[in-house]
């Protein structure tokens, strides 16, 4: 009820020109009221004779001087703006401004309006349609847009999941790298600790040897001094005694005095001492980085038994050793121990056939006085002559190997010279520390085979370049005549 009254009041204070609530209302002689702006705009269209103008509603003439502000209507409009319509009047199907039902849709503004809004200045000239006419069309558009948004939502969720997964992956990778860095630097610290301990042991040994020698020299000098002191005392006693005491055995005393020879003690000039040199940390780091890099390609290598090799293989296929010597009985009950007559027949191949990629493995050769290891392109029966002279261990026969003899002689086997191609070119290798563990790195595409001394922090022992890999190659181990086994290390060792 109250809302209906308010609606009627709004109609009374609505400008007939703009159909909005009156703004600065002005009243004419006929009683109609208009917005000041609307009436001013209308003056240009309704001018009559003698300066008179006509009312836009009833066409009754009026004099501009008779126009007066309608304060009463202005107050009503002000109060009306402050009044809120009842909940019934605020329903979404009624215009908040005019209280009329919202039955029209303005295409230009994209709004639902009432019939009074359609006639207002704001929507004049716009294309309007009944809401029922456009509802289905916009429902289809909204449904299509909704499907598109749902697809976008799904894509966004997938992207969110991807970025979350990438974030977790990066976190895992960084954590792994942190662990690797900690492990690497821990290993470097172990290397430095080993170098420090080794150098201190050398200094302690040097101190012990020098002090022992000097102590011996000191003892000899004390004895020598005491002998001279006793001889001086004897001579002084003779000089202070009687003539008989002076002459008794005087020739012997004089001879003893003349034969006195002072033996100079053994000394150790400081300029001849071994000079301590700190390890080359830069070179050590470079070697360490290279070893760390190739160890990323560590493969688990085991050996493959065959009918050619006489090598003894462990059950886990990791250890290879020389067979038991054969007992030969000679004349009169004498016995002789003989080994297999050629080193070739104690060689064994790894079970992995390599035709591409990068591969790394390590072999434990500690306590062995002889061994050969590296890469082999397969056994070559036609190269089994003069095996004792290592003539088959050449790249031309498919061998890229290094070896140890007599516990100290480390060598690499290269192809023979042009004049004597059958005889291998033995390359003596200078190793500061004899390796107890050797790393082998094969880069098939780069045609290289590298050997690392793991015992000496991974320093490079030797590298074969420009290798001709025309067929599959295999890891190769040969324990020679040393019965101590050589062991293929697992990647986790």
Swiss-Prot record:
It comes from the Eukaryota. It catalyses: S-ubiquitinyl-[E2 ubiquitin-conjugating enzyme]-L-cysteine + [acceptor protein]-L-lysine = [E2 ubiquitin-conjugating enzyme]-L-cysteine + N(6)-ubiquitinyl-[acceptor protein]-L-lysine. It is found in: Cytoplasm; Nucleus. One of its GO terms (biological process) is positive regulation of NF-kappaB transcription factor activity. Degraded in a proteasome-independent fashion in the absence of viral infection but in a proteasome-dependent fashion following exposure to restriction sensitive virus. One of its GO terms (cellular component) is P-body. Capsid-specific restriction factor that prevents infection from non-host-adapted retroviruses. Blocks viral replication early in the life cycle, after viral entry but before reverse transcription. In addition to acting as a capsid-specific restriction factor, also acts as a pattern recognition receptor that activates innate immune signaling in response to the retroviral capsid lattice. A zinc finger (RING-type) spans 15-59. The keyword Acetylation applies. The modification N-acetylalanine is found at residue 2. Belongs to the TRIM/RBCC family. Residues 131-223 form a coiled coil. Residues 281-493 form the B30.2/SPRY domain. Residues 185-198 are annotated as: Required for interaction with GABARAP and for autophagy. This is Tripartite motif-containing protein 5. The lineage of its organism: Eukaryota, Metazoa, Chordata, Craniata, Vertebrata. It holds the Pfam family SPRY. The gene is TRIM5. The modification Phosphoserine is found at residue 86. It comes from Pongo abelii (Sumatran orangutan). Its EC number is 2.3.2.27.
């Amino acid at each position: 009820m109250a809302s209906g009254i308010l609606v009627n009041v709004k109609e009374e204070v609505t400008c007939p020109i703009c159909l909005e609530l009156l703004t600065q209302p002005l009243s004419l002689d006929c009683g109609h009221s208009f917005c000041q702006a609307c009436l001013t705009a209308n003056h240009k269209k309704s001018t009559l004779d003698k300066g008179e103008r006509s009312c836009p509603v009833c066409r009754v003439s009026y004099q501009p001087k008779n126009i007066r502000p309608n304060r009463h209507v202005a107050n009503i409009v002000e109060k009306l703006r402050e009044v809120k319509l009842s909940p019934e009047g605020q329903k979404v199907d009624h215009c908040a401004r005019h209280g009329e039902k919202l039955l029209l849709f303005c295409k230009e503004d994209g709004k639902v309006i009432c019939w009074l809004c359609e006639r207002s200045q704001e929507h004049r000239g716009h294309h309007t349609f009944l809401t029922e006419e456009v509802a289905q069309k916009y429902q289809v558009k909204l449904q299509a847009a909704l499907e598109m948004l749902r697809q976008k939502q799904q894509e966004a969720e997938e992207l969110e999941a991807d970025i979350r997964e990438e974030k977790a992956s990066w976190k895992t990778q960084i954590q792994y790298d942190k662990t690797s860095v900690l492990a690497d630097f821990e290993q470097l610290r172990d290397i430095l600790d080993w170098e420090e301990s080794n150098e201190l042991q050398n200094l302690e040994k040097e101190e012990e040897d020098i002090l022992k020698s000097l102590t011996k020299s000191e003892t000899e000098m004390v004895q020598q001094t005491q002998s001279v002191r006793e001889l001086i005392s004897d001579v002084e006693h003779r000089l202070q005694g009687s003539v008989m005491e002076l002459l008794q055995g005087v020739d012997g005393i004089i001879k003893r005095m003349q034969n006195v020879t002072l033996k100079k003690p053994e000394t150790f000039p400081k300029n001849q001492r071994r000079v301590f040199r700190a390890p080359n940390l830069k070179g050590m780091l470079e070697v360490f980085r290279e070893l760390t890099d190739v160890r990323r390609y560590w493969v688990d290598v085991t050996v493959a038994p065959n009918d050619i090799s006489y090598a003894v293989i462990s059950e886990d296929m990791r250890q290879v050793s020389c067979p038991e010597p054969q007992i030969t009985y000679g004349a009169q009950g004498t016995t002789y121990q003989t080994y297999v007559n050629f080193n070739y027949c104690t060689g064994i191949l790894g079970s992995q056939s390599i035709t591409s990629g990068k591969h790394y493995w390590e072999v434990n050769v500690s306590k062995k006085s002889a061994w050969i290891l590296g890469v082999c392109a397969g056994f070559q029966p036609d190269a089994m002559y003069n095996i004792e002279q290592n003539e088959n261990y050449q790249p031309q026969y498919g061998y890229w190997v290094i070896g140890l003899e007599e516990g100290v002689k480390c060598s690499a086997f290269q192809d023979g010279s042009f004049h004597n191609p059958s005889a291998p070119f033995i390359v003596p290798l200078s190793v500061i520390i004899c390796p107890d563990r050797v790393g082998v790195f094969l880069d098939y595409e780069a045609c290289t085979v590298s050997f690392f001394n793991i015992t000496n922090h991974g320093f490079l022992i030797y590298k074969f370049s420009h290798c001709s890999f025309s067929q599959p190659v295999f890891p190769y181990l040969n324990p020679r005549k040393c019965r101590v086994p050589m062991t293929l290390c697992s990647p986790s060792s």
